Amino acid sequence: MKDNFNRNIDYLRISIIDRCNLRCIYCMPEEGITNLLPHHEILSYEEILKIVEIGVDLGITKIRITGGEPLLRKGIVSFIERLARIEGIRDIGMTTNGVLLKKFAKDLYNAGLKRVNVSLDSLDENKFRAITRVGLIDDVFEGIDEAKNAGLQPVKVNVVVMKGINDDEIEKFALWSKKVEYQIRFIEFMPVGQNAWKKELFISKDEIKERIENKIGKLIPVQMKKSGPAEYFMLAGAKGFLGFISPMTTHICVRCNRLRLTADGKLRPCLFSDKEVDIKKILRSGASTEEIRETIIKTIHLKPQGMSEHTKPLRPMSTIGG
């Protein structure tokens, strides 16, 4: 399915829960989400599967499960198993904070999950706690190791870089890539939802790369299959790779191929926009398959061309889906 700018839309990111067991400073307010969705307002697994099945008929081949923290939702393993049985789905990934990953990794792999992205913004225990406001970093390290051992590969580690908060660890993360077979991805700090975005916290992809090359060594470009918005490099002799995602300084919108489905049933054409379509309302009104199909097509045609059309969304990131 093509949007109005001839981009092929084949990727659906699904937030299955608005709750999280961390309180990351760029994702949700310090007090957490005070207006958590009641159970009946959240899409059921059956409703999600129906939307996915119709989406597959329109060309969706790739699914990513997000939250909140998706591993908090009951029945997640059996849901992944049902999702993996849908003919036409070629790839299922998950974005998680990793806290519960040790417990679930093997079962998720056996159910059909292909890979995981783990959010980890510090390698230091005290700083990790300051950024997440709660949480034990050892749980995340153990979860990452268990994911790799279970076969959920490649493991991608997402690092949101914030000046004066964790930018002093850029070199530590880069050196870590020499020892581990992970894809460590530096992400520019974005103004999304009700996060604590401040211009003075922003550090660009180019500055991050420059610091690595000045202090550690040359970044060797690497071509990755299905790399999405990330640009990949490696250090000489490294086991892992370094990725850079730069939504603020690079025109990544030109190759955007995704839609987002929120936990409360809103279909969103763009992370950086408040445009959304209430597909849950249509679904629960007894709409036909064709009506749901037309709703998905309508949402695809709402996708903006690029950043110039964006307004900062009012939802916290945890309710949109990372």
UniProtKB/Swiss-Prot annotation:
Q: Could you say which residues bind GTP here?
A: 13, 64, 95, 156, 258-260
Q: Which domain of life is it from?
A: Bacteria
Entry keyword 4Fe-4S: yes
Q: Where is the Radical SAM core domain?
A: 4-229
The record's remark on the cofactor is: Binds 2 [4Fe-4S] clusters. Binds 1 [4Fe-4S] cluster coordinated with 3 cysteines and an exchangeable S-adenosyl-L-methionine and 1 [4Fe-4S] cluster coordinated with 3 cysteines and the GTP-derived substrate.
Alphabetical keyword list = 4Fe-4S, GTP-binding, Iron, Iron-sulfur, Lyase, Metal-binding, Molybdenum cofactor biosynthesis, Nucleotide-binding, S-adenosyl-L-methionine
EC numbers, comma separated:
4.1.99.22
Extract one GO BP annotation from the record: Mo-molybdopterin cofactor biosynthetic process
State where [4Fe-4S] cluster 2 binds: 253, 256, 270
Pfam families associated with the record: Mob_synth_C, Radical_SAM
In terms of PROSITE patterns, this protein maps to:
MOAA_NIFB_PQQE, RADICAL_SAM
Name the residues that bind [4Fe-4S] cluster 1.
Answer: 20, 24, 27
The pathway where this protein functions is: Cofactor biosynthesis; molybdopterin biosynthesis
Q: Can you state the subunit structure given in the record?
A: Monomer and homodimer.
Task: Report the function annotation for this chain.
Answer: Catalyzes the cyclization of GTP to (8S)-3',8-cyclo-7,8-dihydroguanosine 5'-triphosphate.
Family stated for the protein in its record: Belongs to the radical SAM superfamily. MoaA family.
* Protein name according to UniProt: GTP 3',8-cyclase
